[in-house]
């Protein structure tokens, strides 16, 4: 996410982007960024990814992968790290459910 003036409001970016990540075996996996947002309570940026080409299951659901986006000093890059707390998981679930309903 590019540099933002974070205030007390939830900031959401729905621009899709493709990212290449590596799985546990070191294989490249292509993901589509489906949602990106900053949450003022946690003071973190989050990205929600879906594996490119993933098919929905019998309940019409696609597995989403939430990550924390830790930007580097330049703001041009950074790293994605796993979600840290149950509170973050709950917040992410609420944001994703709200965004997917719209």
Curated annotation (Swiss-Prot):
Cysteine disulfide partners in this protein: none
Pfam families membership: DUF1292
InterPro entries assigned: UPF0473
Similarity section: Belongs to the UPF0473 family.
Protein name: UPF0473 protein SAOUHSC_01719
């Amino acid at each position: 996410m590019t540099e933002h003036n974070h205030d007390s409001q939830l900031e959401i970016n729905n621009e899709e982007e493709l990212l290449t990540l590596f799985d546990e075996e070191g294989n490249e996996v292509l993901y589509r960024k489906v949602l990106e947002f900053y949450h003022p309570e946690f003071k973190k940026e989050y990205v929600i990814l879906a594996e490119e080409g993933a098919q929905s299951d019998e309940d019409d659901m696609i597995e989403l992968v939430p990550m924390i986006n830790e930007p580097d000093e330049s703001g041009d890059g950074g790293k994605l790290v796993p979600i840290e707390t149950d509170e973050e998981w709950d917040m992410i679930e609420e944001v994703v459910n709200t965004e997917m309903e719209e």
